[in-house]
Amino acid sequence: MHVICNLLRAELSAHATTLRSFAAVAAIISAMNLAMSSGSATPAIAVCILTVAFLPTSLFAQDERAHLDTMYSILPVTRAQFVIARYLCVVLVAVAATLVGVVVALINDAVRGPGAGVLPLSVAGVAGLAVAVLGVIVAIQLLLFFSLGYTRTGMYAYGATMALMFAFGFLIKKFPDLTATIIRWAGSAWTGVLGPGIAVAVLAVSAAGSVRLYQRRNL
């Protein structure tokens, strides 16, 4: 565990510039969504959380540019430890984005009032639902990156993320019953508990697969 913690610190240090740039972009997107929202700020939580879906692409692109994968290969760490550290890095950013989104939404609602939104949304419900969706997207991305590398999957992973988001919006418009179900989930505080649980389970399965596939790769 000590090695993984040190590796995680090295990850955060090596990708500090990328993480700062990502945080700035996420803040701008969330602020724009918040400014355009006339009702409650609760939906802005989902926007803040889902921006993390684009982080894995940036991390692995930086690995390729700076040859960090080569550096990690000569360090006294196993590939499994590197995989776990990368997953923990993304999880930490996701947790930070969730906390920031929730705090900003609560402060906004306290200052401006909850708004006149007609949807019965819960802060915990929206956050939990967004975390579950993010967990699935990130789990797929990381599995692809570790098994095939950024060069072979970079644009495909980015495109798949965009396609999933557009497909989700299309399904909501096409199937009203699905929309009602999602709104019901977003309005339940229990979703705030189940969502992170689903994300953790999916990421655990993805990490196990990534470890096996990454160990077989010829770097």
Predicted regions and their residues:
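Hydrophobic alpha-helical transmembrane segments of membrane proteins
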Residues: 1-67, 85-219
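Short extracytoplasmic
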Residues: 68-72
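Short helix-to-coil transition segments within interhelical loops
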Residues: 73-79
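Alpha-helix N-cap/helix-start motif at helix boundaries, enriched for small hydrophobics
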Residues: 81-83
